[in-house]
Curated annotation (Swiss-Prot):
EC number: 5.4.99.25
Pfam families (alphabetical): TruB_C_2, TruB_N
Name by which UniProt lists this protein: tRNA pseudouridine synthase B
Stored InterPro entries: PsdUridine_synth_cat_dom_sf (IPR020103), PsdUridine_synth_N (IPR002501), tRNA_psdUridine_synth_TruB (IPR014780), TruB_C (IPR032819)
C-alpha cells in the first residue's frame, strides 16, 4: 500500500486481533482504512495471539505510554510435555517429557509466579540485544542469552486442567511474556510446557467487548469505523481528572502551567479537561497543572 499523508483524526479503535497477523500490520490496516495521519498501538500481541489490541489515532498516541504501563489480562492454554524454540506452538520442539502434572500440583506452583518476579523473555521476542531484536538474531541462528527482567504479576489463576493441558488467566504489568510463564511453569512442574493458545481479554480500561472485528475493517466504510472510535481520554481512566479554568486552559494549551479546580496529591500525574475537551496530561502542582503532553485537537 502506498504511503499517504492522511487526515487528522483522534481517538482509540479497539481491535479484536485474529491469529496470524502482527500488531503493526493491524495498525497499518486501521490507518489506511481511516486515512489517518498518525497511528500507533499500546502493547504488542504475538502474531499467533488474539484479542484486545488498542490502536491510537492522532493525538491519542500521546496517551500510549499510560496504557502501555496499565495492567493487562490474558487467557491462555499451556500444552504440557514439550518445550519449543519460541515457547509457543509456532516453534520447533526442543525438549520433551512424559511427565504430566495433576491439578493440585499446578495450583501449588502458581504462587511462585505472582507478585514481583524475575522473568527471562523468550529467545524469539522483540527485546533488543546490542541494538538488534532478539527474534532477528534467532532467525540468523545466533544463540542469545537474555537477561531476566522484573515483572509484576497481579494474579495467575487456574481456570481448568486436563491431562495434557491447562487453562490459565494472568493479570500482569508492562513487559510480561505469557510464553515465558508457560515455559517456566512447565519447568517448575517437571513436565515442560509451551503456550498453545493466547488471548488478551483486557488492556487497562479496554475490554474484548469493545473490540472491532479485524475482518470488518475491509468491509466497513469510514463512517462505520469512526462510529466505533473511543475518545482520547478513554485511556486515561486510571488518572485523576482536573477541570481547568478558562484562563488556565489557555495557558495549558500553550504549554504553560495552568490553574485547575479541585485537588490531587502534589506531584501526582493527572489529566486536564475544559468543557469536555481533553487538554493535557501533567503534574498537579498545588492549584495548577504543569503539562507534560498537550493535546492539539484543533
Amino acid at each position: 500500500m502506498a504511503r499517504k499523508k492522511g487526515r487528522e483524526i483522534h481517538g482509540w479503535l479497539i481491535v479484536d486481533k485474529p491469529a496470524g497477523i502482527g500488531s503493526t500490520d493491524v495498525v497499518g490496516k486501521v490507518r489506511w482504512a481511516l486515512d489517518a495521519k498518525k497511528a500507533g498501538h499500546a502493547g504488542t500481541l504475538d502474531p499467533d495471539a488474539t484479542g484486545v489490541l488498542a490502536v491510537a489515532l492522532g493525538e491519542a498516541t500521546k496517551t500510549v505510554p499510560i496504557l502501555t504501563d496499565a495492567l493487562k489480562a490474558y487467557d491462555f492454554t499451556v500444552s504440557w510435555g514439550a518445550e519449543t524454540s519460541t515457547d509457543d506452538a509456532s516453534g520447533g520442539v526442543v525438549k520433551t517429557s512424559d511427565a504430566r502434572p495433576d491439578e493440585a500440583a499446578i495450583r501449588a506452583a502458581l504462587p511462585e509466579f505472582t507478585g514481583e518476579i524475575m522473568q527471562v523473555p523468550p529467545a524469539v521476542s522483540a527485546v533488543r540485544v546490542d541494538g538488534a531484536r532478539a527474534y532477528d538474531l534467532a532467525r540468523e541462528g545466533e544463540v542469545v542469552e537474555l537477561a531476566a527482567r522484573p515483572l509484576w504479576v497481579e494474579s495467575l489463576e487456574l481456570l481448568g486442567a486436563a491431562r495434557d493441558s491447562a487453562e490459565l488467566r494472568m493479570v500482569c504489568g508492562k513487559g510480561g511474556y505469557v510464553r515465558s510463564i508457560a515455559r517456566d511453569l512447565g519447568r517448575k512442574l517437571g513436565c515442560l510446557g509451551h503456550v498453545a493458545q493466547l488471548r488478551r481479554i483486557w488492556s487497562g480500561p479496554f475490554e474484548a467487548g469493545d473490540g472491532f472485528a479485524f475482518d470488518r475493517i475491509d468491509r466497513a466504510n469510514q463512517a462505520e469505523i469512526e462510529a466505533a472510535l473511543l475518545p482520547l481520554q478513554a485511556a486515561l481512566a486510571d488518572l485523576p481528572e482536573m477541570q481547568a479554568t478558562e484562563i488556565g486552559a489557555t495557558r495549558i494549551l500553550n504549554g504553560n502551567p495552568g490553574q485547575v479546580l479541585g485537588h490531587a496529591e502534589f506531584g501526582e500525574e493527572v489529566w486536564v479537561s475544559r468543557n469536555g475537551r481533553a487538554l493535557c496530561i501533567g503534574r498537579y502542582m498545588g492549584g495548577e497543572v504543569q503539562p507534560s503532553r498537550v493535546f492539539n485537537l484543533g
